[in-house]
Amino acid sequence: MDEQVIFTTAVSGTVCQVHSVGQANLRQCAASTPNSAVLMGDKLLVAQANKALINVYSVDSRSKKEALEQRLPLPEQLSCLAVVENHTGDAGVHQQLPYLLLGSTPSGKLYVWEAGSGKLLTVKAMAHYQAITKMQAIINGKYVVTAGADSRLIIWQTASLVLEEEPKPLYVLHDHTLAITDFAVSNAHNGKYLNSKLYTVSEDMTVRCYQLSSQLEQPQLLATFTFPLALTSIALDPADRCLYVGTREGAFALPLFYKLDSSGATLVNLLQPGKHQIYSIVPEQAGVEVNKQELYRMGQLLCSKMLSCHVSLIRVSMDGSMVLLATGSGNCVVVDTYSKQPVKELAPLLAPGTQTGPVSNIITRSMTVKSDSLLQDLNLADARATEAIKIPALAKTVFDKTGTHDIIYCAPTDTLSSVLPRALDLPQYLDMIAEEDSVFANTPVTRSTVKVVGELAPAKAEALPASSAEAQQSADDTDAEVARLRESLQQLTGAYKDLRALHEKLYEEHEKLLQTSK
């Protein structure tokens, strides 16, 4: 098991792995705005800088293609992309919800396409007053969260965006005073209704945590964390144990279950429901001993610093053991979460002296490393099938919703079913069992002279028969038992043959009755 890392800058796009050395550079890839690249299956969609164009690449680990596959023209330049995926695992949770491609412009306009057909479903002209910085679908695609440079965070219903002419937001949060740069949603949530935690970071140097619930009229603000620097990114541990916050001068690790002593015997939950707490973050300094309990009484928290450079984006590995920090110099640093030490650096392969700028997008996903085996031909066939799939051209005019609308999306394929043997029907299975029984019945009795005594207890080993008379008696008893079992097996085989003959006779009579009735 490995993790694939895809990161882009203003002049490059790189596909690599965390635990291996393979690397590929995507050609003609230029994404200068954050969150302007998304994955749609094995296809990578990148909104090009200063162009009304989306480049499509294949990032399948089996194909390893670097060339551009498709170009999708757009009505205007897009600065942010997101997708709403199909989730068919849970019955009753939007099983027919198609892939939706969301795109936003620097002016705050929101586009919603149906990726299966390319139809433009909705254009929200003033979704935000300024550029949208990030979009994400949550709760199995039921809701879409958008954050903008206008310091607002809006939660939309996906059905409202698709069906209504003028969709209205479900919630609007405007507690920040400057642009919201990033947000993260808790991994511990129910897949059927809105019940989760939302973390937002802003240039006003604060992190705010909200409790999202369908039973509340408005999201409840649980805690506010103030930092000494403007914040650029945020990531959440898979188990919701720690927040990783990025700034222009480094990244901080904020544990949500705060230790008041070095032994960890006393823990405090920083996100207590019903209380709005305000905490100030104090950077931890090496070699300086402080009283964490005294700082906590004053509303201050001690946080460790992971890296001392400009951090534009943060991603956490699948198991939470590593953190990927995208830097302002165009590379990614892999940091161990326990020791807070860098273990690897991922950099694009460019000519010396090339100015890459900060990393604008970073995407991680788990992948299975398969060695050469009997399934190699199957993997090659799947890779060719993936390459053959093309994303349809995106429409520039809004689709007319008055008539019927056929929903088109790619159905999932089960690769294991193609290699598993075909299930046997009952008559064939019974014939196979009868044949095996006849083989065992006609096999002569074989006596082995090997005695296994190593697995017996010492007391049982001493109780073994010593005289030859007792050994002969034991062998006779064994022969009698084998003869009895053989006789029982023959009786069962005969009964099975009689039952099968009766079944065939009744089946023939049934067929005759059907023919006469016609």
Swiss-Prot record:
Function of the protein: Component of the RIX1 complex required for processing of ITS2 sequences from 35S pre-rRNA.
Localisation: Nucleus
Primary site of residence: nucleus
GO MF, one example: chromatin binding
Organism: Eremothecium gossypii (strain ATCC 10895 / CBS 109.51 / FGSC 9923 / NRRL Y-1056)
Coiled-coil features, chain-numbered ranges: none
Quaternary context: Component of the RIX1 complex, composed of IPI1, RIX1/IPI2 and IPI3 in a 1:2:2 stoichiometry. The complex interacts (via RIX1) with MDN1 (via its hexameric AAA ATPase ring) and the pre-60S ribosome particles.
WD repeats: 73-123, 127-166, 175-220, 226-267
Listed GO CC annotations: nuclear pre-replicative complex; rixosome complex
Name of the molecule in the record: Pre-rRNA-processing protein IPI3
GO biological process: DNA-templated DNA replication; pre-replicative complex assembly involved in nuclear cell cycle DNA replication; regulation of DNA-templated DNA replication initiation; ribosomal large subunit assembly; rRNA processing
Cross-referenced Pfam families: WD40 (PF00400)
PROSITE patterns for the chain: WD_REPEATS_2, WD_REPEATS_REGION
Family: Belongs to the WD repeat IPI3/WDR18 family.
InterPro entries, alphabetized: WD40/YVTN_repeat-like_dom_sf (IPR015943), WD40_repeat_dom_sf (IPR036322), WD40_rpt (IPR001680), WDR18/Ipi3/RID3 (IPR045227)
Keyword tags: Nucleus, Repeat, Ribosome biogenesis, rRNA processing, WD repeat
Lineage: Eukaryota, Fungi, Dikarya, Ascomycota, Saccharomycotina
